[in-house]
Swiss-Prot record:
This is Uncharacterized ABC transporter ATP-binding protein YdbJ. PANTHER family: ABC TRANSPORTER, ATP-BINDING PROTEIN. It comes from the Bacteria. InterPro entries: AAA+_ATPase (IPR003593), ABC_transporter-like_ATP-bd (IPR003439), ABC_transporter-like_CS (IPR017871), P-loop_NTPase (IPR027417). Belongs to the ABC transporter superfamily. Gene3D superfamilies: P-loop containing nucleotide triphosphate hydrolases (3.40.50.300). Residues 6-234 form the ABC transporter domain. The keyword Cell cycle does not apply. It comes from Bacillus subtilis (strain 168). The gene is ydbJ. Keywords: ATP-binding, Nucleotide-binding, Transport. ATP binds at residues 38-45. GO terms for molecular function: ATP binding; ATP hydrolysis activity.
Length: 308
């Protein structure tokens, strides 16, 4: 079995007496895009800062590309590229000069690699312009180029689409998807935007109050449903019949949600009608990421101060 690029186990962080992160554990595999989703103040940024070495955890471990954070920090960081909100550059230098300056901090980054990443992020025509003339979207693309210049195995993104218009956000997503597919880069994408996660990620980890509340796979969400919503009367009689016939069913908002393959819905409908039940509709049931997010966060709702 392949080893994860990022492995976090039992991570705790306190500031003073306040618990900021509580027993965080996760894996990110090669070529996988993982969304770290949570409201502002959920602990996402604190976790990102620990991963990139800007903060120290109280307990737990971080392993990147097989290197322990605590004992082999420099080797671990060689495998990391990061964009934290809006990337900063020297505005009086060109995009190329900024990348060249960054490349000089690493070993053996040839100009051919600079050309490659510039083309990948779509900045070829503007790379020799001064960065002060760049739009926010162009700066973000330059940020991606800088972050992947040294071929990191792990790319960390913390709210990277802040301030981008819809076209810029789509452009950004396309570049990240291509990066994961073409170079096998593992991506951890922290955001509070549901739509961004749905459009970009393979899997989402929902975090609130410093704890992981749920993990949801976003792959295969268009497959045939295994649940249906039934509007039927009398509802209690229908529910009793379903559970008595080995169906997994429950009442929900005046309807019944039942586990049933799509191809078996006509047979189920005939059976219900045969029990003198009035069936008004049977529709496929799909639970959106928004539903999952609300379910995970409201089920653990607590009073207290916000995290950072």
């Amino acid at each position: 079995m392949a080893e994860p690029i990022l492995h976090i186990e039992g991570l705790d962080k306190k500031i003073g007496s306040k618990q900021i992160l509580k027993q965080i554990s996760m894996d990110v595999m090669e070529g996988e895009i993982i969304g770290l989703l949570g409201p502002n103040g959920s602990g996402k940024t604190t976790l990102i800062r620990i991963i990139v070495g800007l903060l120290k955890q109280n307990s737990g471990s971080v392993t990147i590309s097989g290197f322990q954070h605590d004992t082999e920090f420099e080797k671990a960081m060689e495998a990391v590229g990061a964009i934290v909100e809006n990337p900063e550059f020297y505005p009086y230098l060109t995009g190329w000069e900024n990348l060249k300056h960054f490349a000089n901090m690493h070993k053996k980054i040839a100009d051919e690699r600079l050309d490659e990443v510039v083309e990948r992020v779509g900045l070829t025509s503007a790379i020799h312009d001064k960065v002060k003339t760049y739009s926010l979207g162009m700066r973000q693309r330059l940020g991606i180029a800088q972050a992947i210049l040294h071929r990191p195995k792990l790319l960390i993104l913390d709210e990277p689409t802040n301030g981008l218009d819809p076209a810029g956000m789509k452009d950004f997503r396309d570049h990240i998807k291509e990066l994961a597919e073409m170079e096998g880069t593992a991506v951890l994408f922290a955001t509070h935007l549901l739509r961004e996660v749905e459009d970009l990620c393979d899997r989402v980890i929902i975090i609130q109050k410093g704890e992981i509340k749920a993990e949801v796979s976003l792959q295969g969400t268009d497959q045939t449903t295994e649940k249906a919503i039934i509007e039927v009367q009398p509802q209690e009689k229908a529910l009793n019949w379903l559970t008595g016939n080995q169906y997994q069913a429950e009442s929900q908002d005046g309807t019944i949600v039942v586990e049933v393959a799509k191809e078996n819905i006509p047979e189920l409908n005939r059976s219900l009608v045969g029990q003198d039940l009035n069936v008004f509709s049977i529709t496929p049931y799909t639970q959106s990421l928004e539903d999952e997010f609300i379910k995970a966060t409201t089920a653990h709702q607590e009073e207290g101060e916000e995290l950072v």
